[in-house]
A protein has these predicted regions:
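Residues that mark the N-terminal boundary/hinge immediately upstream of a DNA-recognition element
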Residues: 68, 94, 117-118, 129, ...
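Membrane-proximal linker segments that couple transmembrane helices to downstream signaling/catalytic modules
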Residues: 5-112, 161-164
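A secondary-structure capping/hinge motif
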Residues: 87-93, 136-148
């Protein structure tokens, strides 16, 4: 699962526009996935669904390595059972899996941008331990973080080589036109 709605960059504050966009996107997602397909989606479930997304997408609560079902339920003012049921029903996983998915996607972003070393990555992404990070990353991505990083670096190098090749070809074609 990728980030559900918004790609984020490091920011210190969330604008009302970002919040509004997320909530509208969540409402559309709700309609497409649940309301229009005969799945019983209660209004109160929709409100909690949007609240969960807001806290994950905008507030990035998944970066807290001590975030638990109890702590998250207190944060969003609901009970643990109800939060667990909504996550299970509408995200098709449990809360731990959902948080780890967000953490791994965030780790992929940091690796892709070259903003973080592999050593500091587990802590920056909200994992309590390095082993939990490696296990979750491998399960979700299908390869180790080191292998993912190597693939990203190879892709970047390949993109650079293609860009240089295309630029050189374009330059040579332009020089040929000038000589004619």
């Amino acid at each position: 699962m990728d980030y559900l709605f918004l790609r984020r960059h490091r920011r210190t504050a969330t604008s009302n526009r970002q919040k509004s966009l997320l909530l509208k996107a969540a409402e559309r997602q709700w309609e497409l996935q649940f309301a229009n397909k005969g799945t019983e989606g209660r209004k109160v479930d929709c409100a909690l669904y949007k609240c969960i997304l807001y806290n994950l997408e905008i507030k990035q609560v998944f970066l807290d390595s001590e975030l638990s079902l109890k702590k998250f339920s207190v944060m969003i003012d609901t009970n643990q059972t109800y939060l667990s049921n909504v996550v299970n029903k509408y995200f098709n996983c449990n809360l731990k899996e959902l948080l780890n998915t967000y953490r791994v996607e965030y780790a992929k972003e940091l690796l892709h941008a070259g903003k973080c070393s592999l050593e500091e990555l587990p802590q920056r992404c909200g994992f309590a331990s390095r082993s939990a990070f490696y296990a979750s990353f491998s399960k979700i991505v299908g390869m180790s973080p080191l292998r993912f990083l190597a693939r990203e670096q190879n892709n970047s190098l390949l993109e650079s080589m293609i860009y240089v090749s295309v630029s050189y070809t374009h330059l040579r074609a332009h020089e040929t036109e000038l000589h004619l």
